[in-house]
């Protein structure tokens, strides 16, 4: 080591005095200037300030140099010099000869350190200085004046890297800091509350080796002086394990979890694991003689199978049956005195020696570092070392994962009992002990929510489906954003954001809670169904259920949360066993009864029966009884009970199925704009019309009491019916949705409902029933009871109990309602008026769907005209009846269009044959007459053949009737001539069509089947079906709403 002479120290002191000399001269000049005149006072003041600054600099330099004596005693310097000289003898590269100098006193060492820092600042950035050279803190370096330039030295250029503890000039063992932070001196880390944490990030791609399948990292904490593991600061303190024995007085090594290439489908190891050593962190960073000089060694290992150990004798001698892949090292304190902590470091990996010379009582990896040549491995390891503050309370676990975590076990029956009870402890909530008092009493009939509660964020693209948990405390929403498709959990009733569950790569079609609300299952078009744990800190996927195609539905079995049933695009129903004690989900059975893709699955409350619906209108009923003690054996005995194939919706996709709360009826939502509730005993169904649904997947729902039916629509309106009578009792027509309302969920314990839509920036809306709003309405109706209509009354929409609170106010018009006499003629007249009103409503709905139904149509722009203001026409006697019997009576809110003639849909004639290539397309033949419902774009139109067949067809394959008549003979020859019946159908006046519509609807309302007219034949039935579809598609004219009640 190069030593400094007293002459050199004196020269350094003269350099320091050199700056103070101009200050003395300036003081004499200042005194002379003061005698000359007051005009030179300013110059004298400046000189005085410069003198004081020079004195401060001298004091600061002396203080910094004295501090170095405490950190670099002469014995340590001599010891390091000897070690460095031994290693320099082994180097093959040439170095510039440095003349030897005699030993110096401690003061000489301080001056030498000061001059070394001046040379260091003058050197270019990234250069490597001699090993063993003393360095001071960076603050002292910045304060040392540079009056003289150091002599240039010839140095070999090296790759740009930050060498913190490099012991050789050739760069072996370079530790590169990827996150450039300012160096940390151990002096700054004197907080005794910190423990050492080593974060293992990842490696670069490892060398291709088929024998490496699940690598892991083993971390050793070794003392450089002794070659042994570092002694504990407190021998009784557990450092690596919670159950360390008292006789273990050193720090045991710790290993990370293995990274399974096959399971994680990646050959780039990314552990991202925090390893905690419960040792005093400042103790490992001190530089005193009695403190250890710590080196961290990292071994990348892979465990061997028993067959490999038995068949290969070379493996039998290796430690613990591990295959050693590579190793790296890191000094906590570098050669420059700075600590390699609080930043991400990149460590060079080395091959382990082929024939290691293992000695007893010596750490093997330390022998590799100190005595064996280092052969670089073509990869690096990324780590971060930092001090961690231990939390005050660490929750015990069944298996301790760190030295601070207690291991506590409980009997199996206690664990199952606690997990199955969801009343006392509500899962996934931080304030689970806080009880929420719901307003709806047990057994009380549900009310129609009439007040807007709040809106929730659903991402940039809206929400596709949502569902309340069984305890009512969490709302799960399957949303879509620019970056992915997260499941967002909101706390109810506060609406507070809880967490996001990220993992799906495409639209989430369905979600379902387990019976105890501890698990959530979702199905997506990315080909997977995922099971999530409902825990406070759990945001990753618990189990993944892979499928060959889109997964449309997924449900937990009500009897056990270990069974998950999924419906897929490949027409298969799969039953999975999801057990927390096993690593992966098990596919128990596949059911292949359906001939088309399965859209919906549901269970009854006991789980004895399962119902599945597909795309061609077939509903299968299954016997699904399960024994909790033997789940897999019970699934093998599942059988199909019967298949429901109704002619009314044959070939129509089933969008959603739900069992009525009484367990004897089934809600069937199909894509023909009709909802049905079927009695499962006699298979008789009641229809509910009004909601438009021809293309989108929409979910409807029944309230927990079974007295209300909610359904969304493609026109952005929510419809409410009474399932017992089939009457439409309410309608949310002013919701701020621009897209189809996809899903509705009613709260299990509160008169609360949630709506969602899948579209650009569509929110999640929550409405709640407010008794005060209903009471204000009742008082208003009593005041105007029996009077003539008062068109000038304007009230807030909150005043109507069945209408939600909206951002705009609507006008309410009170009409007189005269009690009718009990004569049959008067009743028939009212029924006819009622039917005419509903007929006009359906036509108005169809017109609106013509404009907004297409999924490929662009969103409404800013130039689009706003929806016309709607008003309510309240009938007095009917509303009084509603409030007189609130449990049984329901309000019917309907829309009445302005009385104007409705043009019939245009008719076109097919010029060429076309075969449908998708399920939503229409197969046409030459000469077919097609009724056009709407034009999706210039190339594709939507229409019906009049045979109950509807779908899209190419616009260039058809021509209008007038163009067909005027077309040249060559074109007509390519198409067959129209039959007399088809010509009569085309020439039939609109008035007769209207009468057919009215008769057809009258028959359906009275519950009777349409009468077959033999004289009109088959073509007339086709005509009636076509007009019915036309009525259900029209809904665009400006409308008013009328509140009526038919007893």
From Swiss-Prot:
Keyword field: Cell junction, Cell projection, Cilium, Cilium biogenesis/degradation, Cytoplasm, Cytoskeleton, Developmental protein, Differentiation, Phosphoprotein, Repeat, SH3 domain, WD repeat
Superkingdom of the source species: Eukaryota
Annotated Basic and acidic residues bias: 1-17, 77-86, 116-132, 173-185, 964-1003, 1012-1040
GO MF annotations in UniProt: identical protein binding
Subcellular location: Cytoplasm, Cytoskeleton, Cilium basal body; Cytoplasm, Cytoskeleton, Microtubule organizing center, Centrosome, Centriole; Cell junction, Adherens junction
Swiss-Prot/TrEMBL WD repeat ranges: 458-500, 503-542, 546-586, 593-632, 649-688, 692-731, 736-777
Chief localisation class: cytoplasm
Protein name from the UniProt record: Jouberin
Gene from which this protein is expressed: Ahi1
């Amino acid at each position: 080591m190069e030593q400094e002479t007293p002459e050199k120290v004196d020269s350094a002191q003269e350099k320091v005095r050199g700056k103070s000399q101009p200050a003395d001269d300036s003081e004499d000049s200042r005194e002379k200037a003061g005698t000359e005149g007051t005009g030179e006072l300013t110059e004298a003041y400046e000189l005085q300030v410069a003198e004081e600054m020079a004195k401060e600099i001298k004091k600061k330099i002396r203080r910094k140099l004295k501090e170095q004596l405490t950190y670099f005693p002469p014995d340590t310097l001599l010891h390091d010099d000897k070690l460095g000289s031994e290693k320099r003898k082994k180097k093959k590269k040439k170095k510039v000869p440095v003349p030897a100098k005699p030993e110096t006193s401690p003061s000489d060492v301080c001056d030498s350190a000061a001059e070394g820092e001046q040379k260091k600042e003058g050197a270019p950035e990234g250069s490597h200085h001699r090993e063993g050279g003393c360095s001071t803190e960076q603050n002292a370096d910045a304060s040392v004046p540079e009056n003289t330039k150091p002599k240039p030295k010839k140095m070999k250029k090296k790759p740009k890297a930050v060498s913190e503890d490099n012991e050789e000039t050739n760069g072996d063992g370079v530790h590169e800091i990827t996150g450039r932070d300012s160096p940390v001196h151990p002096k700054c880390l004197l907080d005794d509350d910190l423990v050492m944490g080593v974060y293992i990030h990842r490696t670069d791609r490892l060398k291709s080796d088929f024998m490496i399948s699940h690598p892991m990292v083993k971390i050793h904490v070794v003392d450089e002086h002794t070659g042994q593991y570092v002694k504990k600061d407190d021998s009784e303190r557990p450092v690596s394990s919670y159950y360390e024995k008292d006789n273990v007085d050193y720090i045991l090594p710790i290993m990370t979890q293995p990274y399974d290439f096959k399971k994680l489908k990646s050959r780039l190891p990314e552990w991202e694991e925090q390893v905690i050593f419960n040792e005093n962190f400042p103790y490992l960073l001190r530089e005193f003689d009695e403190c250890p000089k710590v080196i961290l060694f990292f071994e990348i290992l892979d465990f061997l199978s028993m067959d490999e150990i038995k068949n290969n004798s070379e493996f039998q001698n290796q430690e613990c049956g591990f295959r050693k892949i590579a190793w790296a090292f890191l000094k906590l304190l570098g050669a420059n005195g700075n600590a390699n902590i609080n930043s991400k470091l990149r460590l060079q990996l080395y091959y382990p020696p082929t024939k290691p010379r293992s000695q007893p009582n010596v750490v093997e990896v330390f022998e590799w570092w100190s005595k064996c040549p280092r052969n670089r491995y073509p990869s690096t390891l990324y780590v971060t070392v930092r001090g961690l503050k231990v939390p005050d309370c660490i929750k015990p676990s069944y298996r301790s994962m760190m030295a601070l975590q207690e291991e506590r076990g409980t009997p199996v029956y206690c664990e199952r009992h606690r997990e199955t009870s969801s009343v006392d402890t509500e899962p996934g909530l931080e304030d689970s002990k806080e009880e929420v008092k719901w307003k709806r009493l047990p057994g009380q009939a549900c009310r129609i929510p009439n007040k807007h509660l709040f809106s929730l964020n659903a991402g940039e693209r809206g929400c596709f489906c949502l569902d309340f948990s069984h305890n009512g405390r969490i709302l799960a929403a399957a949303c879509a954003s620019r970056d992915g498709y997260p499941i967002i959990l909101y706390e109810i009733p506060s609406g507070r954001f809880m967490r996001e569950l990220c993992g799906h790569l495409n639209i989430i079609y369905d979600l379902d809670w387990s019976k105890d609300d501890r698990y959530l299952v979702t199905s997506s078009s990315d080909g997977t169904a995922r099971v999530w744990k409902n825990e406070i800190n759990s945001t990753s996927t618990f189990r993944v259920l892979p499928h060959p195609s889109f997964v449309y539905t997924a449900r937990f079995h009500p009897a056990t949360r270990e069974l998950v049933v999924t419906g897929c695009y490949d027409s298969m129903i799969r039953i999975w066993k999801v057990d927390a004690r096993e690593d992966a989900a098990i596919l128990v059975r596949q059911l292949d009864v359906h001939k088309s893709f399965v859209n919906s699955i549901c269970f009854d409350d006991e789980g004895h029966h399962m119902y599945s619906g597909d795309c061609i209108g077939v509903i299968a009923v299954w016997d699904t009884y399960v024994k909790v003690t033997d789940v897999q054996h019970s699934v093998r005995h599942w059988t199909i009970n019967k298949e429901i194939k109704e002619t009314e919706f044959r070939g129509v996709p089933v969008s959603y199925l739900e069992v009525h709360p009484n367990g004897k009826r089934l809600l069937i939502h199909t894509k023909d704009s009709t909802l049905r509730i079927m009695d499962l005993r006699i298979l008789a169904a009641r229809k509910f019309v009004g909601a438009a649904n021809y293309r989108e997947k929409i979910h409807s729902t029944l309230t927990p009491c079974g007295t209300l039916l909610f359904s969304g629509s493609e026109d952005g309106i929510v419809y409410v019916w009474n399932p017992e009578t089939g009457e439409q009792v309410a309608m949310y027509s002013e919701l701020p949705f621009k897209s189809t309302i996809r899903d509705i969920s009613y709260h299990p314990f509160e008169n609360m409902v949630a709506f969602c839509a899948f579209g650009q920036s569509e929110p999640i809306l929550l409405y709640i029933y407010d008794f005060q709003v209903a009471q204000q309405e009742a008082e208003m109706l009593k005041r105007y009871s029996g009077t003539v209509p008062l068109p000038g009354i304007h009230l807030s929409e909150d005043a109507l109990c069945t209408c939600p609170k909206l951002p705009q106010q609507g006008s309410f018009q009170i009409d007189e309602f005269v009690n009718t006499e009990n004569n049959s003629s008067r009743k028939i007249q009212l029924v006819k008026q009622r039917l005419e009103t509903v007929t006009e409503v359906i036509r108005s709905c169809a017109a609106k769907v013509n404009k907004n139904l297409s999924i490929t149509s662009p969103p409404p722009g800013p130039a689009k005209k706003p929806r016309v203001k709607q008003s309510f026409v309240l009938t007095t006697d009917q509303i009084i009846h509603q409030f007189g019997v609130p449990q049984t009576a329901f309000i019917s809110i309907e829309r009445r269009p302005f009385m104007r003639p409705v043009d019939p849909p245009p008719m076109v004639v097919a010029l060429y044959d076309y075969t449908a290539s998708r399920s939503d397309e229409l197969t046409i033949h030459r000469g077919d007459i097609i009724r056009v419902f709407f034009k999706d774009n210039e190339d594709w139109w939507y229409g019906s053949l009049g045979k109950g067949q509807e779908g899209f067809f190419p616009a260039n394959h058809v021509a209008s009737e007038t163009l067909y008549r005027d077309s040249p003979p060559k074109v007509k020859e390519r198409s067959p001539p129209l039959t007399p019946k088809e010509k009569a159908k085309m020439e039939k006046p609109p008035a007769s069509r209207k009468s057919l519509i009215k008769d057809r609807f009258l028959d359906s309302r009275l519950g009777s089947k349409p009468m077959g007219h033999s004289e009109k034949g088959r073509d007339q039935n086709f005509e009636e079906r076509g007009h019915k579809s036309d009525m259900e598609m029209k809904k665009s004219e400006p409308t008013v709403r009328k509140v009526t009640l038919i007893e």
